[in-house]
């Protein structure tokens, strides 16, 4: 009969015994052996055919050791076995004041793990501490064997969890797995109190406090705390492929994205891309007769001169277009402008630049009204003073999705219709919606004496006014045609157009201030439009018109129907809706 040797003196004294699959036992479950050590009373008497291994870790009863010493530098107790023992696994701590006990017979010892499996079991400590992957295990339907600590020993030497049936390669993995059933988290952070089931998770957590980032990218200065995060980052440096990493790469700065739409958004703020557009625009402007077809966006450096601060309406346009992902229908972005001197709304040779001309293209009150066409009264808008002919070459294009000023560039002016920003330049030949409204008095014997505009039933307008995508004026003093809106085929109203538009939609309010407006397509046919009488805005889409009318109050048209804010006029109302500063309650 073999008697186990006495435990070292530092292990003597009261303590609780716990197996990996059991709860803490009381002191009644302990009995002292003659040598003074603590032996659980549930252990069988040691015989020639049986032996046991005890692995334990005790903390000093004084309690002066810190958590860091407990989990990072605590001494590990030796493995104690009988002379017949042929296998001893490295000891691991369960928790403070706990003992892990393993029992197996000599018959089991004949089926111990081979050298390869013993090597894997020794590597369990690496798996437990690294803990970046799930514990090794699989479901096995093998029959039960005599009980091992907290599990069932299988014929292949592995352990099976007696709670869920998970098969573990060794006792250490099973021990960590059992904590998912018991809720035990023995590893604690002494700085924030967070607890973990594995030591590797605690070590990784400590890096958050120390700021350590050991994993560094070999291609750039990126660093991170986790290996899997570095693996995900390395995909950005991989070869562009639809199946690997982020295939959509910016050719100007090298950044990669997972989606084409994200790449398009990036190009709107990519400094290198905008700088290349600026250089390309200057090169094209220096070649007379060439058309600007590849210009997708004009940067702010081209929109405004260095000595002139950007106006509020232009800054508003830029801020609104950045929110295109949240809008039902996107704005017409900054696109190509082609303009010729023959299309200018004044006589170049006469030098009469005092004529005020206003061009409003695809205006909206808020991001939700992306398909609306604004018609703001010309008598209230700020006039655009066109300079004499000797200054035409010094003009720079001012392009905005909210307020567009008409200034010359080589070629002729074309504004695209409401379409997605990512479409190619092959669709640019279709002219966008334009509204031309002269400020000067119109001399026409058949015009109305109040505003000088012809009636909508007049059919004597020039055929040149119906040219697709272009609104032009004669060069001399002949009578001017009524204001005309030319709508491209991309407009939402073009698909819904009625060959006989309602007269009420094309006329202004009857009375002394009656106005006439013709909305035609690019081939000259009439297009249905919906006009807000309060804001004097034309909508080509009935849905957007309905949404807009819902913003007006029932009692006062300039009362916000969302928050109840009262505006003095339609400009203040439009500004309030655009800003979206609704204070409800």
Swiss-Prot record:
List the SMART domains: ZnF_C2H2
Q: Where is this cross-link: Glycyl lysine isopeptide (Lys-Gly) (interchain with G-Cter in SUMO2)?
A: 100, 500
What else the UniProt entry mentions is: 'Eos' means 'rising sun' in Greek.
- Give residue spans, biased composition: Polar residues: 79-98
Alphabetized Pfam families for the sequence: zf-C2H2
Q: Which GO terms describe its biological process?
A: negative regulation of DNA-templated transcription; positive regulation of transcription by RNA polymerase II; protein homooligomerization; regulation of transcription by RNA polymerase II
Q: Where is this region: Disordered?
A: 1-43, 68-98, 410-489
**Which segments show compositional bias classed as Basic and acidic residues?**
25-34
Locate the motif CTBP-binding motif PEDLA: 425-429
Job description of the protein: DNA-binding protein that binds to the 5'GGGAATRCC-3' Ikaros-binding sequence. Transcriptional repressor. Interacts with SPI1 and MITF to repress transcription of the CTSK and ACP5 promoters via recruitment of corepressors SIN3A and CTBP2. May be involved in the development of central and peripheral nervous systems. Essential for the inhibitory function of regulatory T-cells (Treg). Mediates FOXP3-mediated gene silencing in regulatory T-cells (Treg) via recruitment of corepressor CTBP1.
Which family, according to UniProt?
A: Belongs to the Ikaros C2H2-type zinc-finger protein family.
- Domain remark from Swiss-Prot or TrEMBL: The N-terminal zinc fingers are involved in sequence-specific DNA binding and heterotypic associations with other family members. C-terminal zinc fingers mediate homodimerization.
Q: Where in the cell is it found?
A: Nucleus
Q: Chief localization class?
A: nucleus
- Which Cys-Cys disulphide bridges does the record give? none
Q: Which PROSITE patterns match?
A: ZINC_FINGER_C2H2_1, ZINC_FINGER_C2H2_2
Q: Which SUPFAM superfamilies match?
A: beta-beta-alpha zinc fingers (SSF57667)
Query: What are the start-end ranges of the zinc fingers (C2H2-type)?
Result: 159-181, 187-209, 215-237, 248-271, 530-552, 558-582
- Subunit details: Self-associates. Interacts with other family members; IKZF1, IKZF2, IKZF3 and IKZF5. Interacts with CTBP2. Interacts with SPI1, MITF, FOXP3 and CTBP1.
Q: Does the keyword Phosphoprotein apply?
A: yes
Is Amino-acid biosynthesis among the key words of this record?
A: no
Q: Region (Interaction with FOXP3) spans which residues? A: 281-585
Give all Phosphoserine modified positions. 105
Q: In which tissues is it expressed?
A: Highly expressed in skeletal muscle, low levels of expression in heart, thymus, kidney, liver, and spleen. Highly expressed in THP-1 and M-07e cell lines, which have characteristics of myeloid and early megakaryocytic cells respectively.
Name of the protein this chain belongs to: Zinc finger protein Eos
